[in-house]
Amino acid sequence: MSDVPEDANAGCPGTGSAGAGKASGCAGCPNQGACATGQGPPPDADVPKIQDRFSRIKHKILILSGKGGVGKSTLTSNLARALASDPSKQVAILDVDICGPSQPRMMGVEDEEVHNSADGWTPVGIQPNLTLMSIAFLIGDKNDAVIWRGARKNGMIKQFLKDVDWGEVDYLLIDTPPGTSDEHISLVQFLLQAGPLDGALIVSTPQEVSLLDVRKEVSFCIKTKVPILGVVENMARFVCPNCAHTTLLFPTSTGGAEKMCEDSNLELLAQLPLEPALAEALDNGEDFFETNPDSTLAKSFMDLAEKVKAKLH
């Protein structure tokens, strides 16, 4: 919706709707009084810029996780490579994990710089049909901590959306921070203002402590009207690098992601194994599909990419 203020609550009905300032989602919003009297805040002048940038992006996918350390960024990078295995498709990654950007290291472009032109920021190329934008490219020292309050983080996310010159893109994967923070609310609002959002992939691990937060992530998507494409269970089992025997790594005391998806009427798109070779490839910025093309995990990522494409078309 183009009439949702930047600082509005999640689930804002829009300043021009009949429920403006009166709906349950308006409680506590700084714009509630103005909206209720028909004097809502002025329209965001950056919305048309975001709409223009995203008009050339066919599919936009959020990668979410309720908890850190479940492999969300790992999934993002390898799903992007799997989608980009089709040379006719243009794929891009937007890393909006402002305080913990890891995509540049994983994709082997940690020392690259972003170039600015009259058309905006040019994302860093990984291969001819795969590009990346991350705040890590804008920080002088990669070991410097990003200590920003919410408003500045949101401003950076907005700048990514309106100033990056992606060009024509078939699939944009957006790697988000863990949880459901202020950045997620602002990001979703900006994206919905730019047009339809294809949906979210939610990443979990099998144990209940992770699934507890996944259920909150599902609730967030429902409240913000973000479609859920499905759930990916990462580290579902361990694959021995010597004999390829698989072993359950984490307890599934409540049935794991499979049972949670069944209870929540969600689709479990993949149960990805844990392979030590992947960690080595990511640390070295290597393409896992080139170093381990016949591995169980590489095939699982390719299968996941096909399922995602089927859901989008």
UniProtKB/Swiss-Prot annotation:
Heterotetramer of 2 NUBP1 and 2 NUBP2 chains. Disulfide bonds: none annotated. Its cofactor is [4Fe-4S] cluster. It comes from Caenorhabditis briggsae. The lineage of its organism: Eukaryota, Metazoa, Ecdysozoa, Nematoda, Chromadorea. This is Cytosolic Fe-S cluster assembly factor NUBP1 homolog. SUPFAM superfamilies: P-loop containing nucleoside triphosphate hydrolases (SSF52540). Its main location: cytoplasm. One of its GO terms (molecular function) is iron-sulfur cluster binding. The keyword Thylakoid does not apply. Belongs to the Mrp/NBP35 ATP-binding proteins family. NUBP1/NBP35 subfamily. InterPro entries: AAA+_ATPase, Mrp-like_CS, Mrp/NBP35_ATP-bd, NUBP1/Nbp35, P-loop_NTPase, YlxH/NBP35. [4Fe-4S] cluster 2 binds at C240, C243.
